[in-house]
């Protein structure tokens, strides 16, 4: 087990112990894809990496999202065409191979999205490979200046009493942490070299080492869908 210091906490206790059996690795060399099938990931970071998220589709004048790596190469895309906040969204690579399918679910009053990792390029292969579930902790009125949190259930943490990760918004930034408060990724508005912030639809994402950035993008998309941004 490992002990991490929780940086943004005002409670009296300072440390929290994370039992290994309740945690899901963001991505080990060999990992389980929902149904216990082992598969290697080509999306694991070896060091801190930066990405640019453009909340626009490559298809002209349609809804979606495009993700670039630090060299300007397109690595992920989402094309919703004329639909916004639809019930099912596909995260694809540049070639159009489906990596994750995100589906909206109805659980009480809270908005919930589930992510299904594909074992191949076909949409049908995602039917039973549930990978994560994202929902807001409480009913929240969207406000760009407020703070809100979202719990992420994944792997062995499938019930609502446990969560493996959480997303916290602070103003216009989004932080993704494990359940011990260790930062895994952060998304904020992109700035130019001169320090000027670009448009609201251009974001920069920093992903820490040993993190599956395809999984992180899936969580960012779920957050955008919950808040009707995508």
UniProtKB/Swiss-Prot annotation:
<protein>
    <recommendedName>
        <fullName>Protein LURP-one-related 11</fullName>
    </recommendedName>
</protein>
<comment type="function">
    <text>Might be related to the phospholipid scramblase and tubby-like superfamily of membrane tethered transcription factors.</text>
</comment>
<comment type="similarity">
    <text>Belongs to the LOR family.</text>
</comment>
<dbReference type="InterPro" id="IPR007612">
    <property type="entry name" value="LOR"/>
</dbReference>
<dbReference type="InterPro" id="IPR038595">
    <property type="entry name" value="LOR_sf"/>
</dbReference>
<dbReference type="InterPro" id="IPR025659">
    <property type="entry name" value="Tubby-like_C"/>
</dbReference>
<dbReference type="Pfam" id="PF04525">
    <property type="entry name" value="LOR"/>
</dbReference>
């Amino acid at each position: 087990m490992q002990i991490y210091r929780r940086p943004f906490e005002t409670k009296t206790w300072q440390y929290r112990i994370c039992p290994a059996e309740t945690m899901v690795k963001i991505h080990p060399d060999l990992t389980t894809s929902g149904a216990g099938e082992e598969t290697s990931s080509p999306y694991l970071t070896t060091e801190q990496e930066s990405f640019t998220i453009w909340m626009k589709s490559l298809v002209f004048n349609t809804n979606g999202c495009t993700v670039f790596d630090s060299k300007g190469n397109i690595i992920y895309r989402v094309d919703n065409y004329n639909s916004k906040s639809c019930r099912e969204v596909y995260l694809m690579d540049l070639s159009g191979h489906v990596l994750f399918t995100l589906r909206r679910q109805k659980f009480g009053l809270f908005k919930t999205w589930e992510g299904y990792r594909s074992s191949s390029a076909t949409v049908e292969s995602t039917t039973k490979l549930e990978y994560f579930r994202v929902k807001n902790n409480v009913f929240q009125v969207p406000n760009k200046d407020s703070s809100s949190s979202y719990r992420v259930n994944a792997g062995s943490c499938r019930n609502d009493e446990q969560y493996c990760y959480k997303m916290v918004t602070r103003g216009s930034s989004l932080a993704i942490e494990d359940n011990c408060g260790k930062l895994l990724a952060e998304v904020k508005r992109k700035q130019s070299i001169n320090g000027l912030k670009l448009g609201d639809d251009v974001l920069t994402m920093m992903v820490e080492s040993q993190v599956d950035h395809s999984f992180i993008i899936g969580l960012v998309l779920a957050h955008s869908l919950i808040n009707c941004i995508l």
